[in-house]
A protein has these predicted regions:
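Secretory pathway targeting signatures of secreted, lumenal, and periplasmic proteins
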Residues: 1-102
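Short, well-structured beta-strand
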Residues: 77-172
Length: 172
């Protein structure tokens, strides 16, 4: 797999942190050294949805270059939680990444799980939004979902979106 890296950003391969059975693992860092996204392959996933939360889909884009068995994954930036809180306890309230799962519908959604089908099982490329890590303009005391919406309009987010949506197989 290959992707387009924003100027002045770097990729770090944290040696020794691969999934059992191999795979790739890379951290993408901005010029200040902050981790903006991670790419991992050969991920074994499983989840259950025992509780749902209010959500908002802030941005999506289809990624046909990553289609597997007729399923076209999507880039998504989405939130979970209530307007006045940073999200459910122990669950990140906003994240951006690639997903093969269906986008939420109805008034509530399961916690964010950004994984996509990739041989031999699945992969991930994305991160959770953190206003302490992601350069977000405006009043830092705004409710968390509002900060995520403001972040969506930044140049940093545009770079992240362009980088993640550029992911493609090397052989194609």
């Amino acid at each position: 797999m290959v992707f387009d890296l924003p100027a002045a950003w770097s990729v770090k391969d944290p040696a020794g942190e691969l999934a059992e059975g191999g795979g790739a693992y890379a951290e993408v860092r901005n010029k200040g050294g902050r981790v903006m996204a991670t790419l991992r392959t050969n991920m074994a996933i499983g989840s259950s949805c025992t509780q749902k939360y209010p959500y908002e889909v802030l941005d999506t884009a289809d990624l046909p270059a990553l289609a597997q068995d007729g399923v076209v994954p999507q880039f998504a930036f989405e939130t979970r939680g209530y307007a006045g809180t940073p999200g459910p306890p122990g669950v990140q309230a906003a994240g951006y990444g690639i997903t093969s799962g269906p986008m939420p519908s109805g008034p509530e959604a399961c916690p964010i799980l950004h994984f996509f089908r990739w041989p031999p099982n699945s992969a991930m490329f994305g991160a959770f939004y953190d206003p302490a890590n992601n350069a977000t303009p405006g009043d830092p005391s705004l409710p968390y979902p509002e900060l995520a919406k403001k972040y969506r309009e930044t140049a940093e987010y545009a770079d992240i979106r362009e980088m993640i949506t550029s992911l493609r197989p090397v052989a194609r």
